Swiss-Prot record:
It is a peripheral membrane protein. Keywords: ATP-binding, Cell inner membrane, Cell membrane, Membrane, Nucleotide-binding, Translocase, Transport. It comes from Salmonella typhimurium (strain LT2 / SGSC1412 / ATCC 700720). It is found in: Cell inner membrane. Its main location: membrane. This is Spermidine/putrescine import ATP-binding protein PotA.
Amino acid sequence: MGQSKKLNNQPRSLSPLVLLSGISKSFDGKEVISQLDLTINNGEFLTLLGPSGCGKTTVLRLIAGLETVDAGHIMLDNQDITHVPAENRYVNTVFQSYALFPHMTVFENVAFGLRMQKTPAAEIAPRVTDALRMVQLEEFAQRKPHQLSGGQQQRVAIARAVVNKPRLLLLDESLSALDYKLRKQMQNELKALQRKLGITFVFVTHDQEEALTMSDRIVVMRNGVIEQDGTPREIYEEPKNLFVAGFIGEINRFDATVIERLDEQRVRASVEGRECNIYVNFAVEPGQKLNVLLRPEDLRVEEINDDNHIEGLIGYVRERNYKGMTLESVVELENGKMVMVSEFFNEDDPDFDHSLDQKMAISWVESWEVVLADEEHK
């Protein structure tokens, strides 16, 4: 965040594959997508991220042709597919349920789409075998779905989707049914497979960590509109508003009031009652309310004892959570606000494992903060 962690925002030379222009969609008179514009580039892994009901799955279904738009246009490879039936789009979808045929073998499940397309019989076996080899299931070709684990079923669904060589693969929360460890493994496998195939993936999830792990680009949605579109690092370190900041990982929000502008970058402000310099890249006036945002890992804490005087926000440790590599502390400021602090665990530091009710000073590296206008006092 800020100056010390400046992002590399070099433009990427990617060509557009899908263009959504002015897309609107309503169900039962309720608008779920509103004037949405989105470009999806060739060969990228793009994630639509947002809470339940934000419209992300509807966008996926509109691209797939499983729903029709009320307004706007969808282009695929410079062709208008707005009103093209789903079966005639070079787009395949992997659903949350995988939708495998229980009475068919793995081989026949993967071959199903090829047979429906009337692919020559001589081509089917080698293409299915290649697809199963890609997802490391070649030896499971004659098994039925019920004989496979959840992760293996997921890979069958992906093999069935890619065997048709689609231009675009859509995945609708397709990892959510897996347990935590298997989901982490599949995240890595899915990203590696996407790089190997070179197919554009559009992935829908409400899991922020999943989006950060897998994506080249994340589109954060709320109430049918795009709140922010950027790389995982941009979304995490440079949130554009309080919703994005709060939705992507843990973040602390401090109330601030402008005292005066010092120069083009810095403002003197009172942050939770403490005067300090903050980096503000927009026009402000004395007395204006601001939000200062800091991730738990960007905060520094130091114990205050009788014999030392330390600058910072003063508070007291109320909770401690040991998480292996990190120690998370909840610190209550003197004004009652709760602050989350995350530190890498250091067993060699005798002062590291803070005791409950220990008096602490909280500070941060100047310019690591993200500053936003106070949305409540605009």
